[in-house]
Amino acid sequence: MDLNGFLLDEEGAFSLSGFQEFTFLPRHQQLSERVRKRLYYGWDKECTLDNLSSPVADIAVELLQKVAPSPIRRLQKKYVSHVSREACISPCSMMLALVYIERLRHRNPEYLQQISSSDLFLISMMVASKYLYDEGEEEEVFNDEWGAAGKVDVQTMNTLEMNFLSAIDWSLYTDPRELFEVLSWLEGRVAEKQGMWRGWFTYTDLCVLMEQSMWQQALGHFYQQVVKLACLLGVVYLTGFAAVFTSIAVVHRAVCTRSTSITALRPALIPVESGCQLGAQPALAPEQPQPKLPDVSPPSSTHCLGENETAEELRRGGVTATALYLWGSVMTALSYVKAPDIALHKSPLQAPLRKVPTACERSNRTAPVTAPNQPGPFGLAVLLAPPALHCHTCSAAARPTWDATPNHRKDWLDPLGLRQCFLHAALDLGRIKSFIFPS
């Protein structure tokens, strides 16, 4: 870039008129984009920043009416728009004027009580513009032009200017940090006002508000409350979850205990397996004395006890107890079935080994024998079977007996020696059919 042609005029003399264009500075471009974006000046880069935007004018009216509460010539937005358009007030002039007003509010509040808000706006903008655009610049505006823009004569403008400079003690220099602080405050006020007016905030408004210290503190406090609420809800949720699981466990345990107690009160409903009935002795009459017999239980009795313990453990569940009850009912009904003799030889599965006396034997049994004199299995005395009364359809050998002959000795009863009444068998078979096929 040729600085000589930029700084020197046609006659070769040094000229400062070229410094009126600062658009080539990168910081100037960033500041211009920031002002356009956050102060609602629009996205059109062709539009010049030579007047105040509507949101900025609203903030100026609100602030000056509060600072200068005099009822004479109260500042209106229409007047602000007219002056800013006629005098070409830039956003930087507006921010510098706000810095001056803030100084007056702290140094000379009496001056603000005497001047009207319209005059304060006019004179503060004029002093700020003169400070930014000194004499010799193209943007300079004389007092008569400011008076015409504000509808005030030149003498009144001169008086207002002298009083303003005296009240501020001619302290017009402003540090750039003060200017950017005012810019940040103005951006926050504009974003807040516009968001509240529309009912929603733009992304730019939210970014501006997040930069404000007051909003940061408020959002931080809000986040803390949200975190506390989330923790409280989490504790309540976990407590309720644990309470539900505990209640389910207690109810389940109570149901299981109740099922176990009911099953223990009715043990006869669950039949003993057929393998354990082989070692059962015939029931004796309650009025007769029962002799003491030696333990001649086969080795399979230990297996029966183990099966009984297993069955006792299975009864503890309600569903298992119900299944066992149904199965026992079926087995009890099937125990009365009498198959023909031919079927017994052909199908050994239909003739289970059992030692339980039949219905006829239980109803017609008499007193037991007096003394065990005959030798039994394993060289032990065996109690002879008592004489029993049978109906005419039952065989005389229907009761189980031990073979007392020494040459032909059996450790177990003859499975084919049991006989039943055919009449009862027919009735029980019909009952089984009704149980399996109710319809």
UniProtKB/Swiss-Prot annotation:
Its main location: membrane. GO terms for cellular component: cyclin-dependent protein kinase holoenzyme complex; membrane; nucleus. Keywords: Membrane, Transmembrane, Transmembrane helix. The chain crosses the membrane at residues 231-251. It is a single-pass membrane protein. Residues 283-302 are annotated as: Disordered. InterPro entries: Cyclin_PHO80-like. One of its GO terms (molecular function) is protein kinase binding. Gene3D superfamilies: Cyclin-like (1.10.472.10). Pfam families: Cyclin. Belongs to the CNPPD1 family. This is Protein CNPPD1. The gene is CNPPD1.
